[in-house]
């Protein structure tokens, strides 16, 4: 699952990456049984990888509506927050069922994406929950 949030255009690549690293490190420190911020597959087994490296200039990520090179031909599908559920797994949308998804929607779930633009928070990842 890639979480995408629109930032005000004044945010610079290095500060966005640093903020996302702080958030990833904070999440993995607060809930080490659930999250990890290191790429090592051995360290992330059974955990959710918070991959802050996708936020670096030149980093790649799968494009919306792209077919993945995996069994069943899953498709990268933009969703609204309201559509998220535990039933939607990485292979939920495929080249077989995407046409019926399009037929059952009113349009692009990201149509108003830019309306949610916000500045990069200055304290991201610094506020830690108490244990």
What are these regions (language model features)?
Residues 14-131:
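C-terminal accessory nucleic-acid interaction domains of nucleic acid-metabolism proteins
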Residues 1-5:
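Short, conserved phosphate-binding/catalytic loop or strand-edge motifs used
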Residues 7-13:
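A generic structural motif
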């Amino acid at each position: 699952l890639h979480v995408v949030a629109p930032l005000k255009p004044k945010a610079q690549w290095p500060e966005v990456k640093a903020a996302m690293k702080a958030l990833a490190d904070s999440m993995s420190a607060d809930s080490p049984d659930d999250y990890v911020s290191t790429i090592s597959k051995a360290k992330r087994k059974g955990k959710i990888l918070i991959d802050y490296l996708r936020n670096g200039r030149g980093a790649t990520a799968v494009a919306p509506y792209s077919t993945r090179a995996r069994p069943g031909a899953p498709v990268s599908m933009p969703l609204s927050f309201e559509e998220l559920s535990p039933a939607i797994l990485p292979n939920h949308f495929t080249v077989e069922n995407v046409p019926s998804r399009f037929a059952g929607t009113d349009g692009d779930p990201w149509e108003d994406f830019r309306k949610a633009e916000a500045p990069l928070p200055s304290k991201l990842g610094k506020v830690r929950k108490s244990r």
